[in-house]
Amino acid sequence: MAVTLVTSFASSSSRFHFRSFSSSPSSLSSCFVRFQFPSRLRLAFAVTPLYSSSRAMAHTISHATLGLTQANSVDHPKISFSGKEIDVTEWKGDILAVGVTEKDMAKDVNSKFENPILKKLDAHLGGLLADVSSEEDFSGKPGQSTVLRLPGLGSKRVGLIGLGKSASTPSAFQSLGEAVAAAAKASQASSVAVVLASSESVSNESKLCSASAIASGTVLGLFEDSRYKSESKKPSLKSVDIIGFGSGPELEKKLKYAEHVSYGVIFGKELVNSPANVLTPAVLAEEALNLASMYSDVMTANILNEEQCKELKMGSYLAVAAASANPPHFIHLIYKPSSGPVKTKLALVGKGLTFDSGGYNIKTGPGCLIELMKFDMGGSAAVLGAAKAIGQIKPPGVEVHFIVAACENMISGTGMRPGDVLTASNGKTIEVNNTDAEGRLTLADALVYACNQGVDKVVDLATLTGACIIALGTSMAGIYTPSDKLAKEVIAASERSGEKLWRMPMEESYWEMMKSGVADMVNTGGRAGGSITAALFLKQFVSEDVEWMHIDMAGPVWNEKKKAATGFGVATLVEWVQNHSSS
């Protein structure tokens, strides 16, 4: 008896037909599936994106996932930031948060503060601030904070937040913002003011960046990803006044910039936090399409399906995707300013493995972290998070291509095997000696594609090697580039954003380890210098006339203490793009 099943999935832009045939119930082994796709794949499933165009921060995924899991809808509160120049004793609100160094906490022989700001506050509080800070053993060390309910000021509470020896870097001011957010959450405060006890330590030139870092830290500190929990708390903080850092349109613009970047970071965090049974390659592609829809005045999207990737001869990328029941989706977002000339074309390429089992070289044993391999798309999350922020900021004079070869690395009879030889889209051949070194195989074709867009510079980001974690730990990413100029640009951007990068060598002699007897190269070169040989591999797929950098972010993509994604890379990428704009 013949069996025929026809199922259709429709979207606003296309219709998909999945037709299965079997000659009889007893010959299911001969069953095959025919896929009929339109020329451009727009939707693979019925999906409600993480971000709805009607609400800037709406997070719902409605999808028949394994486990029937759906993300709860979460609306993140909007915080109003403003710069003010007022007497701290006159500010009215819930918490007056004072950032203090260890030096600021010094007291005279009468146990009174020597710092002018603390002395003024203590005078209005009848000496209680000095007394209580001593009782609390608060000394201004980093990580220390205390919130006191003391009568005598316009604010309901006074918070002291330790800055350590000094506060002069963006990361220090971001930490101050995070501490402010923690205090606000604990007290359910709706209004907070932030002031430094010693603002003279901040130069006039750096006040804008410092205020921006405080704002960013506050937004990120308030964020909790509760989409997959049965209960969640909604932060009550509505407004933050930053005192002593200036005021006016220039500061307001910088604070708004920080807000846009922060929500891009949050988007990146949520993508990485999403489990692999929810965030498939199709859903990741839909998130990219939704960004293009949200910022349609400056952004367009092109999602390539498997057949289109075959036409482009992406044999390396498609080999990785071959074992998965979830088809690959090649994502290409393009940002173009709505007006004015384009002076620079950039490409941001992110590794997009929504799950990595390791393939036939399956991840086994302690430390393999297979349960965390949802974060193997951290590079793509950084790229799409940057796209979200750039869509909001709209920098003039620069065109940006956001590229992700999204897929899963699974195990099946159709999957790539150790020993297989793959042909990338630039014609180079690769002998697979480890199926768990798959990220570089997807990036190979993505880099070729990026260079073919006529860009001047390419930066790729990937959770690529454990070797980089061994070398640098989990607090910083390694950068690899032949270009000293590009290295300086990206490092400068990271310093302003507060993210840590360290330049690693591109030791060309190590390429000997990557040679194959049957192909142009192998995909791994052994344990020694593993992150360097990975970068040398990627270099083979970059045009000589394009400046290129690889960022290995395997370490800082995940915060094990918080058991959550960090959103690493977004802020640096946005800052780097902004530095190329004509604004």
Curated annotation (Swiss-Prot):
GO cellular component, one term: vacuole
Residues at which Mn(2+) 2 binds: D356, D436, E438
Residues forming the catalytic site: K363, R440
Disulfide feature: none
Origin superkingdom: Eukaryota
Transit peptide: 1-70
Function: Presumably involved in the processing and regular turnover of intracellular proteins. Catalyzes the removal of unsubstituted N-terminal amino acids from various peptides. Possesses leucine aminopeptidase activity against the model substrate leucine-amido methyl coumarin. Does not seem to possess Cys-Gly dipeptidase activity.
Quaternary structure and interacting proteins, as annotated: Homohexamer (dimer of homotrimers).
Protein name: Leucine aminopeptidase 2, chloroplastic
Native species: Arabidopsis thaliana
